[in-house]
Design a protein with these regions (language model features):
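Secondary-structure "cap/kink" motif recognition
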Residues: 5-13, 149-162
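N-terminal carbohydrate-binding/catalytic regions of secreted carbohydrate-active enzymes
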Residues: 3-8, 12-31, 39-44
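PLD/PLD-like phosphodiesterase catalytic module centered on the HKD motif
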Residues: 27-90, 95, 99-104, 109-130, ...
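Short hydrophobic beta-strand segments
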Residues: 14-17, 142-143, 163-167
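Mid-sequence helix-capping/hinge segment at a functional interface
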Residues: 127-146
Length: 358
């Protein structure tokens, strides 16, 4: 999490945060420190899902320290996870600021410095900060807003010509499922990677019967938990964001993601997805041909067998010298280290990062 903490510590003028769940004391202290040194900090927290109980401690800590903090409109869930610094750059996240999950959960952060995107994010934040109910945000260049993102994400899946790799926490959107099944029937190599959940068994079976590779992780404390929300199309463009594949998330919640073709994002993203595909368990009844991988599988150990990994120094190919490396990035290189079961953080020279669990 160090790169994200560093980003949160970097503002000269302003920091705006919209967060579904905030329970990270380190993040809270950074926000307080920013406020004390004169940065305009505004923190918008979800209130609807739990009546504020999940975020109450963070709300109290920040407000006691004088940090401007507000509850989002409680007519819908504010599931967005975004941090914008100085109106120049935004961290668009699939995960919450909840430290108990950092080492065991698959999530991603993408940095967006596209001026039109950041301006759109700030415009939506200003409206949300005023207490308004969520509505589709300004489109920017690459942004995907909920409410109303289902057609945009289904169209992204439909655009595939070779492969689609998906990670998500939920599978309860007819439009998304139909798009995945349609791709598979027309010969696109489609892979869905999720944590096993009986709630989605019917969807998994239908996807598999239409030729989709369904790769599952057990819902146990020792296994990687798939919380990320990703659609990787042809290893050439990808959606990364907060949207789950459910009617509530796509059509009602406040959510934010983006679609990117940036090589600095796709490199580490494709590597992580490939590792997740190769380390998961294929669903019974799925197609017997090898599942799609965004790039050739990494040699990472399965999440159930943590390994101490050294990710410094970096070899000539931008990888780690250590065998079984999990901390991997594109040709910009990566830095990071982890002990058994701890989180590994990688960052490239363009400031794009992701984290993985051993």
């Amino acid at each position: 999490m160090t790169p994200l903490y560093d980003f949160m510590s970097s503002p000269r003028q302003s920091l705006d945060m919209t967060m579904y769940e905030l329970s990270d004391p380190t993040a809270e202290q950074i926000l307080i420190a920013d406020h004390k040194r004169g940065v305009r900090v505004r923190v918008l927290l979800d209130h609807d899902y739990s009546g504020g109980s999940v975020n109450q401690a963070a709300y109290a800590t920040l407000s006691t320290a004088g940090v401007p903090v507000a509850w989002a409109n409680d007519s819908e869930i504010f599931h967005q996870k975004t941090i914008t610094v100085d109106g120049d750059e935004s961290a668009i996240m699939t995960g919450n600021l909840t430290p108990q999950y950092y080492a065991t959960t698959r999530d991603f952060v993408v940095m967006d410095s596209q001026a039109a995107d950041v301006a759109a994010i700030e415009s939506a934040f200003a409206r949300d900060w005023s207490g308004a109910a969520p509505s589709p945000g300004p489109p920017g260049v690459d942004l995907v807003w909920s409410p109303g993102s289902e057609p945009q994400l289904a169209a992204l899946i439909d655009s595939a010509t070779r492969s689609v790799v998906v990670e998500n926490e939920e599978m309860n959107s007819t439009a998304i499922e139909d798009a995945l099944e349609s791709d598979a029937r027309r010969g696109v190599d489609v892979t869905v990677v999720m944590t096993a959940d009986a709630e989605w068994d019917s969807a998994f079976s239908q996807l598999a019967s239409d030729g989709v590779h369904v790769v599952l992780y057990p819902d146990t404390s020792s296994a990687l938990y798939i919380h990320a929300k990703v659609i990787d199309v042809d290893s050439a463009k990808a959606f990364v964001g907060s949207e789950n594949f459910s009617t509530a998330s796509l059509d009602y919640n406040r959510e934010l993601g983006l679609i990117t073709s940036s090589a600095s994002v796709l490199g580490p993203l494709n590597s992580a997805l490939s590792a997740d595909v190769s380390n998961g368990q294929p669903q019974q009844g799925a197609s017997t041909s090898p599942p799609a991988t965004a790039t050739p599988p990494t040699s990472a150990p399965p999440p159930s067998s943590p390994t101490t990994i050294g990710c410094s120094p970096i070899d000539d190919e931008g990888g780690c010298y250590e065998p079984g490396e999990y901390c991997r990035n594109d040709d910009h290189g990566a830095t990071g280290r982890a002990g058994d079961g701890q989180t590994i953080t990688c960052e490239d020279e363009n400031g794009t990062w992701y984290w993985e669990s051993t």
